Amino acid sequence: MKKYENTGSKDTRSGFGAGMTELGQKNENVVALCADLIGSLKFDDFKKNHPERFFQIGIAEANMIGIAAGLTIGGKIPFTGTFANFSTGRVYDQIRQSVAYSDKNVKICASHAGLTLGEDGATHQILEDIGLMKMLPGMTVINTCDYNQTKAATIAIADHHGPVYLRFGRPVVPNFMPSDEPFVIGKAILLNEGTDVTIVATGHLVWEALLAAEALEARGISAEVINIHTIKPLDDEAILKSVGKTGCVVTAEEHNILGGLGESVARVLALNTPKPQEFVAVNDSFGESGTPEQLMEKYKLNNQAIVEAVERVIKRK
């Protein structure tokens, strides 16, 4: 298969900003709402080019969600933007009541997700947001892996009717997905074919999964790597097809072990074809302050942790 290479590291939030810039030019119904974080969400170009479609709500996230829900009634497609912690935990009641329950066409765009927010620490990091959002009926949940995929996802969700949670991050990470790769909601992407183990990864852990596959190949272990950008609806077919071939799976995510991708995959397997599974995720704890690199190592969210999980799960086949 094609070998994926880092074409130049970028932050995924800049991919979101680039997607918003393109949407601003293409779709006059797209509007942006920001909770006092224009630079952090990379809304600068959209605000400059379309000031009449940009709304600075301030540090009033609950109001932002309510306003966004109202704008959909007039045919607008609102994209809200703030940190992932404030996009979910702080406004969960408003999302449930005003957006999800009434199936409003709001795009909840959440930057600085996971541990890799870094030095701001546990009060600003969030590791439970995927679980919160995937439990809401009708909510589509997307977690992108690099700049190119985040840009493509941002553009794609504008054409999807219904509430969407789009999750991306702050740090600079490898950019390896092709810029012309189609983004299809709910369809996994097979990155590397293998026969011994399936690695199902999402977000920043996708690149780490590819690095792990290289290391495993040197040890004589053939790893299949699947990029799951859409947590809900999950591509059950792709997972079952791969695990049916390899006989075991490792899930990898920058999220709590409870409520995330790993649990969704476990449910699919339990209902269809139970197989050994190992989880690479945060073991039910809050984060802390540190550089992204320090935190990913401490909480075992890197390629070495994936390799170790693969070695464990293969022994259980």
Predicted regions and their residues:
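Thiamine diphosphate
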Residues: 1-167, 172, 182, ...
